[in-house]
């Protein structure tokens, strides 16, 4: 278990632990955190996750060398997927592509545009929508965290292979069972 993961996305940790427990080799690289982060990279390394970080390794060189061996690609968030899409298509052609939306970003961005009455935000939301729907349509599986998101993607946009997996959380430090706490 992890004691200090407040800044790491809990669903990412959950999925990495899940895959490790089932015998998969897990490789992590973050678009926004490509460097060794002293507070968090050692946590992933202790879990047995291989971390690709600069300056030791550049992700494109890593994928060029090892991408052919990947069975699965598990990518979280539209901006990560967009950032790495060309590399995956070039170097990881045989891998099953799993896109974890975390949340459907364009819906949140459209709402923000309405709240702030911003045409610029709306334009950005439309671009995010185009990219997010394209990635979800091309993925072998797309994960959403709510039934409403699943319904939206399937019924409004006609997407297939949408999997509803609610966010998993380990509750640490519970003081007794539900009955004892009531």
Language-model features, listed with the residues they occupy:
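Conserved nucleotide-cofactor-binding alpha/beta core module
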Residues: 26-68
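N-terminal subdomain of nucleotide-sugar transferases
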Residues: 1-35, 41-42
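Helix N-cap/beta->alpha junction signal
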Residues: 77, 101-103, 146-148
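Short N-terminal targeting/anchoring amphipathic segment
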Residues: 64-83, 96-98
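Acceptor-binding helix/loop patch of EC 2.4 sugar-transfer enzymes
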Residues: 94-95, 99-127
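Conserved donor-binding/catalytic core segment of Leloir-type glycosyltransferases
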Residues: 1, 143, 171, 178-182
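Donor nucleotide-sugar binding/catalytic pocket of nucleotide-sugar-dependent glycosyltransferases
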Residues: 133, 137-154, 158-174
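A short helix->loop->beta-strand "cap" motif at the edges of active sites that frequently abuts
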Residues: 91-97, 159-160
